[in-house]
């Protein structure tokens, strides 16, 4: 609906952790038990949960530390569990990015800390987000306001870094580094819509919440500006087929709806459709109507699921 600098190279910060999580569920089930392990030279850096080598937990618990609490050490542990080596895991991340079509992305770590040659773009983050949204196990974790873990010996509550979760933003991930600024991928399911927003380089204010304010502004503008536009009501005449004996009117059996700008007229006049814009074939049950331009200069293509054929030919 709205984009700005969507192909510009940016630092992904902890949004990187979404790719890390995808690779974990590619290799393990969430109920599997794993043992934490770190490289010998590993030093805790940034936000960490102080996981220790030898600790045992489920994959789900590890994903909670990665996606909810955003712990960097949990990402390093994940890379060791999946690949046995951090650099090999990074190769898997980049291979997965290529497979998904994230052509303006290169990962150089699994946690998102600023690093040379560690970059992505908003469009690539959109691709990554859509892939995460397909995984119900990851979404179930991402949507939790908090989780409890006893890795420190006693039960401790770890809060979700997503401060909009109580406002129906189920996620997907927050981030913050010096290069990325404040960044957030939000998915809001209010008003019978699923709207995904991605903000990057929000100014780091004292409360470190400008990315949430920017997200709410984007969401509000999208709700105010866009809607489902009804192009044809149900049972409205679509096309008339005539020959020397019979005149048959084709009606649509469902409304034709296009999501678009509520301030732009989207109604299409079908009386301009001619024979080279509608295909009739007696041996096929589905046909395309292609209307080159609507009033707002957009190209629409409509696909019939059922199309009646009455003693007509392509020259009629």
Which residues fall in each region the model found?
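Domain-terminus/edge residues, biased toward the C-terminal soluble/receptor-binding domains
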Residues: 102-103, 117-119, 123-316
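Active-site-adjacent loops and short helices of periplasmic peptidoglycan-processing enzymes
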Residues: 1-126, 130-136
